[in-house]
């Protein structure tokens, strides 16, 4: 069975308040190092920036686990996932902790429809490291909001890439939001999708 591999944050949901709360927690935690962090963030991911400041990813996970995940069930997402699960193996791949991944999926109402999920705790390095995409096979579909982090390696492996939100010439398809996914799948030549 072919898989759809989803990024989580800013792909399956968009919640500005949660994003702001997480960033505030990081800045408060860093204290006087926050200015260097902001400078590093211009070129590196959150985790890489923290690593360059001498913090382990476990610090980040513990910090994020304390932020309340203020999401509600998403009926449109639930309906879409139920339909897609009939034809695809549903996988979520995220850089956040296992707790945050599971809690987010539960709150959105799609945890039971996800066959597998992988968190930042499952790999030595974070996306976009190649090791994080060991589950991606040629012909799988990968959906994410950041081409470099979520889709570049899968595309190199022969996956079909769908970018959510951003403009990017290298993705196979682009959608404005996750709810447009089904309309794109109709144009992908997949023998198992009608």
Model feature map: region roles:
Residues 1-4, 82, 96-194:
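Asp-based, Mg2+/Mn2+-dependent phosphohydrolase catalytic module
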Residues 2-79, 97-99:
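N-terminal helical cap/lid subdomain that shapes the substrate entry/recognition surface
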Residues 13, 37, 64, 88, ...:
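A general structural-boundary detector
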Residues 14, 92-94, 163:
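Hydrophobic residues in well-ordered beta-strands that form the structural core
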Residues 19-20, 24-31, 37-40, 51, ...:
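Alpha-helix C-terminal capping segments
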Residues 40, 50, 67, 91, ...:
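Short, flexible active-site loop motifs that bind/organize anionic cofactors or intermediates
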Residues 55, 88-89, 110, 159:
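Short phosphate-binding/catalytic loops that engage adenosine nucleotides
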Residues 73, 93, 125:
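Residue-level marker of regulatory loop/turn positions in helix-turn-helix DNA-binding domains and
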């Amino acid at each position: 069975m072919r898989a759809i591999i989803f990024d989580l944050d800013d792909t399956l949901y968009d919640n500005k308040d949660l994003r702001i709360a997480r960033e505030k927690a990081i800045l408060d935690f860093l204290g006087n190092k926050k200015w260097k962090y902001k400078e590093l963030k211009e070129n590196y991911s959150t985790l890489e920036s923290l690593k360059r400041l001498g913090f382990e990813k476990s610090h980040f996970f513990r910090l994020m686990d304390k932020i309340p995940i203020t999401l509600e069930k998403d009926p449109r997402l639930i309906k879409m996932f139920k339909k897609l699960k009939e034809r695809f193996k549903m996988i979520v791949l995220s850089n956040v902790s296992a707790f945050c991944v599971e809690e987010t999926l539960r709150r959105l109402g799609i945890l039971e429809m996800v066959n597998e999920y992988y968190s930042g705790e499952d790999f030595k390095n974070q996306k976009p490291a190649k090791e994080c995409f060991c589950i991606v096979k040629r012909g799988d579909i990968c959906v994410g909001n950041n081409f470099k982090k979520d889709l570049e390696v899968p595309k190199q492996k022969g996956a079909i890439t769908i970018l959510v939100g951003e403009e990017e010439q290298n993705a196979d398809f682009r959608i404005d939001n996750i709810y447009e996914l089904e309309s794109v799948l109709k144009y992908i030549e997949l023998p198992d999708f009608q």
